[in-house]
Each structure stands twice: as structure tokens, then as C-alpha cells.
A protein has these predicted regions:
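N-terminal Rossmann-like dinucleotide-binding module
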Residues: 1-56
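Hydrophobic residues in well-ordered beta-strands that form the structural core
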Residues: 62, 102, 127-129, 158, ...
């Protein structure tokens, strides 16, 4: 007999859709004892949230998140709201005994994150943060190769996440669609939005980051705010680049911008070790590029592993070898790991929880502090 986990989703935008798709797909492709049930969705616009509930198969809807988290027929709450509300909603969920699945980043800053971690760990409630890219098969394969020690000593890690959607000066800030440009709602710009993904993956694969030296730039200093209709200062970072040192002694370069004309979502990382190197590109997400210095010189060169075989992480749960997976599958994979953990609570967690996400938040905080001070900044331990 399957054990139902009744989900309450708060927010029905881009992430609300991706998470809802994962809830709908999980039981078709992964055999877990606990299964999600789409119980309720919450949004402020009654007409829109009702339509979303009907389209995605939620049994009911609310227009006030406070009412949703108090409902006795909700077991777990999925927070898909702007960053400034994560902490408040999560703390209310904990008071009401709800499991939490929270969008990234964990909070606006480390101080908020600490409060969330302290409360959720005291409660013992299962908790997850949606850092999804690590659950793409090729990325998980990279982690497995590094963990097996195949690279030897790691020397370098580099990552970038490039977009171009905010170049126009006519683009306003704030509101439902553009809250990422409003510091009050987002906390930061590309650092918390895009680099947080790069940092999470890097820490997962290569260990903790101990210090950073960063620079940021806001290219357009003022934008019309949708709430007031008047021009206001833009205080988020449009671009950020930083150097980093890992605990294992390796060096790193990270870069992110929303001003790289021609790039819609270019996320790449590369790891260089004494024996092997690995590289990955979101645009070719099913492939992991692999260089092995140990093969004979006349056979040496970069090769591509098509991570769609049944032996590759997660791929065997889907189609036959050679058929590709996409961005949306990463959310189903993360959800599968969460539900496997509910099935076996004593097993090692294979997904990012609040404490791991707090470590990423600390790196983001250090990056912003370094950019402001112009100095190297040590990263707080989570």
C-alpha cells in the first residue's frame, strides 16, 4: 500500500509548473513507497490559481498561503515564491509540522538561512532545496567520477552561467514577472539566481569553497518599477565574476551575467585534475566530455560520454539507451531522491537540504561582501 504525501504548492509560475510536472511524473518512472498527491495550490489571483489547479490536477486551491500551511490535509509544502518570502513561509510550515520543499536560493541571506536551518533541524521535518542541475545524468556521472578518485588531485574548477534577457533599458523591475530585477524581492541579481546553481554544483562535486574575491556590475542604474510607475535605482548585480579557493586546495573561476548577447542559458563547468578532466554544457546536457591522460598518446583526446545508458544515473528509469532526457527530468530525479529518503529515513540523503543550501548561501554572501569591499573574504562554514 502506497503512502500518500499530500502536497501544497505555493506559487504557480515557472517553478510551479516544473515542480507540478515532477509530481505528475514521479510514480510513472520511479517506484517509491511514498507518493505525492497534488492536494492544493496557492496563488493571489483566484481566477488564475483555479485554472492552474484544474490544468495540473490539484484537488483544491487557496489564495492565502497562511491558510494552506494550516490545513490538516497538507503534509508537505512546496515554496515556489520570490526569495523574500522563503523564510517567512518556511518558518510557518515548521510551526504547522509540514515537510518543506523550497525553491533556491534558500533565503535572502545567510542570517535568514540560519534561522530556517535551526528551526527545521529542531523539528526533525524532512526538507529539500530545489538545486536541480546536479540531478541531470551527465552531471551526476561527473560527481561519481570525481568521488571515485579518477581525476587524482583536482587543480581547477571553472563555471559560468550566461544569459542576455535584461539588456534592454525599457525592461522594468518588480512585479510578478520581473521580481528578479528588484533587490527587495530577490536579494541579489545573478549571484543568487544563476551563480547559486554553479556554486551548489561545484560544492557538491569538489567540496567546500573557503574564500572568494569578487567583482560585480550593475549596467543599467535605473529602471521603471512596476509598482510605482517611476524610475528607481537598480541595486541588484547584473553581472558577477569571482575567484575562489576550495578546501581541497583547487582554484576556481566563476562568471555570470544577464548581458551576454546571444546566450539564453549557457551553463557550463569544467574540472581539471592531474589524471583526467571533465566538462559539461547545459546546451548538450546529455553528454559529459571526458579527457583521460592515462591512455596511449596516439589515442589521447577529449571524448563525449552520452549519459543515456541504463548504467548511467537515472537514465534507466526512462527510455531505451540513446534517447535523450531534458531539463524537466532533473526535477523528477531530485523528487525521487527525496521520496526515497522518506522510504528509508536512516539512509544517506542524496539531495540538498536546508543545511547544504545554507552553505551555498554563505558563499553568495561572501561574494557580495567581497565585491563591495574589494577584498578576499573567507566563507562562513555551514
Amino acid at each position: 500500500m502506497k503512502k500518500e504525501i499530500r502536497i501544497g504548492l505555493i506559487g504557480y509560475g515557472f517553478m510551479g509548473r516544473t515542480h507540478s510536472n515532477a509530481y505528475s511524473q514521479l510514480s510513472h518512472f520511479f517506484d517509491t513507497e511514498h507518493v505525492p498527491v497534488r492536494q492544493a495550490v496557492c496563488g493571489r489571483d483566484q481566477q488564475k490559481v483555479a485554472a492552474f489547479a484544474e490544468k495540473w490536477g490539484y484537488a483544491s486551491y487557496e489564495t492565502d498561503w497562511r491558510e494552506l500551511v494550516k490545513r490538516p490535509d497538507i503534509d508537505a509544502v512546496d515554496i515556489c515564491t520570490p526569495n523574500d518570502s522563503h523564510a517567512e513561509i518556511a518558518l510557518e510550515c515548521i510551526k504547522n509540522g509540514k515537510m518543506i520543499l523550497c525553491e533556491k536560493p534558500l533565503a535572502l541571506n545567510g542570517a535568514q538561512g540560519e534561522e530556517m536551518v535551526k528551526a527545521v533541524e529542531a523539528s526533525g521535518l524532512p526538507n529539500l532545496v530545489w538545486y536541480n542541475y546536479r540531478f541531470l545524468p551527465a552531471v551526476t556521472l561527473a560527481k561519481n567520477i570525481v568521488d571515485a578518485g579518477e581525476l587524482g588531485r583536482v587543480f581547477h574548477y571553472r563555471a559560468n552561467f550566461l544569459q542576455d534577457w535584461t539588456i534592454s533599458e525599457e525592461l522594468p523591475q518588480g512585479g510578478a514577472g520581473l521580481w528578479r530585477l528588484d533587490a527587495a524581492a530577490a536579494g541579489s541579481g545573478v549571484t543568487g539566481d544563476l551563480l547559486a546553481h554553479c556554486i551548489d554544483t561545484a560544492r557538491w562535486i569538489n567540496g567546500d569553497i573557503v574564500s572568494v574575491s569578487a567583482m560585480t556590475e550593475t549596467f543599467i542604474k535605473e529602471r521603471v518599477h512596476t509598482a510605482t510607475g517611476a524610475k528607481q535605482a537598480v541595486t541588484i548585480d547584473d553581472a558577477c565574476a569571482f575567484l575562489a579557493r576550495f578546501e581541497n586546495g583547487s582554484l576556481a573561476i566563476f562568471e555570470s551575467t544577464r548581458y551576454a548577447r546571444g546566450h539564453k542559458a549557457l551553463y557550463t563547468f569544467e574540472i581539471n585534475g592531474e589524471k583526467k578532466s571533465l566538462a559539461w554544457d547545459l546546451h548538450d546536457m546529455n553528454y559529459l566530455s571526458y579527457f583521460d591522460h592515462g591512455v596511449p598518446g596516439d589515442r589521447r583526446g577529449w571524448t563525449n560520454i552520452h549519459a543515456t545508458d541504463g548504467d548511467h544515473p537515472y537514465s534507466g528509469n526512462w527510455w531505451v539507451p540513446g534517447l535523450c532526457l531534458g531539463y524537466e527530468h532533473s526535477f523528477t530525479h531530485e523528487l525521487a531522491e527525496f521520496f526515497k529518503s522518506l522510504d528509508n529515513p536512516t539512509a544517506e540523503k542524496r539531495y540538498p537540504d536546508f543545511r547544504h543550501a545554507l552553505g551555498t548561501q554563505y558563499v553568495c554572501d561572501a561574494v557580495l561582501e567581497s565585491a563591495k569591499s574589494g577584498q578576499w573574504v573567507d566563507v562562513k562554514k555551514s
